[in-house]
Amino acid sequence: MKYLKFTTALVTIAFFSCSQNEAITTNSPDKNIKVDVTLSEKGALTYKITHKNSEVIKTSKLGFDLEGIPSLKENFEIINTTNSSFNETWQMPWGEQLDVVNNYNELKVELQETSALKRKLNIVFRVYNDGVGFRYEFPEQENLSEVLITEEHTEFNLTGDHKVWWIPGDWDIYEHLYNTTKLSEIDALQFANHENLAQTYIPNNAVNTPVTMKTESGLHISFHEASLVDYSGMTLQVDTENNALKSVLVGSENTSYKVKQTAPFNTPWRTIQIAENAGELIESNLIVNLNEPNKLGDVSWFKPTKYTGIWWEMHLGKSSWDMASGKHGATTENTKAFIDFSAKNNIGAVLVEGWNTGWEHWIGFEDREGVFDFVTPYPDYDLEEVVRYGKEKGVEIVMHHETSAATETYEKQQDTAYALMQSLGIHSVKTGYVGKILPKGEYHHGQYMVNHYNNTIIKAANYQVAINAHEPIKATGLRRTYPNTISREGLRGQEFNAWASDGGNPPEHLPIVAFTRMLAGPIDYTPGIFDIKFDKWKKDNQVNTTIAQQLALYVVIYSPVQMAADLIENYEGNPALQFINDVGVDWQETKVLNGEIGDFVTIARKERGSENWFVGGITDENARTIEIDFSFLDAETTYEAIIYEDGRDAHWDNNPTSLAIRKLEISNKSKETFKLAEGGGFAISLKRK
């Protein structure tokens, strides 16, 4: 596949001298967003951002504290500035769309201390039509070689007490419910302990990113980071009195610094997505565009796919991961049943969890190193036979590597484990990192684990293996650079509905996720639960949506690997299964048709390699009526639409399986009205006639 479609020439103008108090400016290509950079009287570098002449970020400072030497925050002079422009269209090997426009104006500001040390630091701003990214560059220099960062001081001073959708700044896990408050009302420390989380650490009143806000004027802004490599993850500490955020890097109990680097190096990009409506946030490509181009070349060995698997039954308690319980789920017989079902229903893969030895001692113990063996199956699971049988049926096995957060054990076995996969023709693995990180004192989002996750991706690519990571580092767009980074969890997923003591994910959860976590990248949410109440297995839990919303999630919550997560017996004979059979997983283009954060969202996606479109819409706990304008469809073309929608009496709690299915002809002149039940949704397949 040709990834680079066209690129305009880079045009650069350098200014080698400027007034130290004069604002240096760059704009977005459409001139709507402007960045002003200045030096304060104390020589601190500051920036501010405006959108259509209204401030978005007030004057905010930048800098670092370093271990054992003076900080890099003040006493700077500007020694050079460079403005440039760039415009290209590149192609995603898989993704929400094929063609991605990467068009920005760049400002590079080169600083040097006025003190005797004369240390240098550069700041690079890239301004797009959909937001701003900036990063620090530590150039090679005599007076600063090894860099030990104790804290990064990146400020985001806001213009008001915005409405915020946030989760706490947990150094270990992203599996919290989202909160909706004013910025001044954020209290992350109230979530410092949670009985359903295997690991959690919230040291500050901070939030994790992406964190999304809406101003009183209706502007939408979201803060995150891009290209997180060899650095610690960033949380944002909240100043509730002054309406401000400031970076707090994830640390380690094993070092007094948070980042160790050697110049020259760059930090991750700090990103601010800016949109006039909520849907534009989802359509933004700022995060992926700030990452380096594909370093792997041809990755056609990975095929986006739907999958079933031995997973949900463990969360329900029907079976278990280990053999000692007497209810082992990962048997040859059970796997073949899933292969047969998948082959009949246009589903390309089967995930098998609990196949390998070690599950009897995987969680709740300090001595977890050496527990898992990533090549040795349990006696009742014939790995070679299920792979052979799957190939016969056209179904690939998805490998599973739960590490129990014992990183050294996994690193020692990776070559052997990936070589086994390659020899069997298995091209994807779901990894897991449940529990506190070993070695002790490290956190899931610190530099140690950032490097572990990224090195795992690179090593796996050498064996043509793609990674779907659970308990991962946050997504920051590295799927562009390493497109074997296919999906990840990194949010409170479907499994919480099976056993969470708080009753699972409320109906507003996913209408928030679409505008927060999903801005970072693909989500392995595992939709498609048809037995919403599952009273046979659990009396106090359920999925808090209608079945129509479960179908809609295949379109709304993006991932190139989408699970049909329920038990086989809950699918068989159910006409709703046809949508899972039909729906695509790889997209030519994506359009957000409407949406408000935490309330509702409707997304349309066109399948690659066909002329078919699919539409999904979901709502929170409130019923609503939505009109869809189908003008996005091809002109002078008729489509056969199959609509799966909430029944008249549907309700996420009282009657979640009430579903109506109807067919009609649709064209780009059509408009249709859909009634969404409380916690409901609708899904549409549109096949060109």
Language-model region placement:
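Carbohydrate-binding surface patches
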Residues: I597-T637, F682-S685
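Conserved, mostly hydrophobic/aromatic
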Residues: Y136, S342, I467, V556, ...
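Aromatic- and carboxylate-enriched substrate-binding clefts and catalytic-loop regions
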Residues: G354-W537, N541-Q542, T546
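Bacterial Sec-dependent N-terminal signal peptides
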Residues: M1-T25
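An acidic-aromatic substrate-binding cleft motif
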Residues: K258-F341, N345, A349
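N-terminal accessory beta-strand-rich subdomains and adjacent acidic, glycine-rich linkers
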Residues: A23-L296, S658
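C-terminal beta-strand-rich structural cap/linker in extracellular carbohydrate-active enzymes
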Residues: K663-K689
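Glycan-recognition and catalytic regions of carbohydrate-active enzymes
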Residues: V109, D566-F614, H651-N655
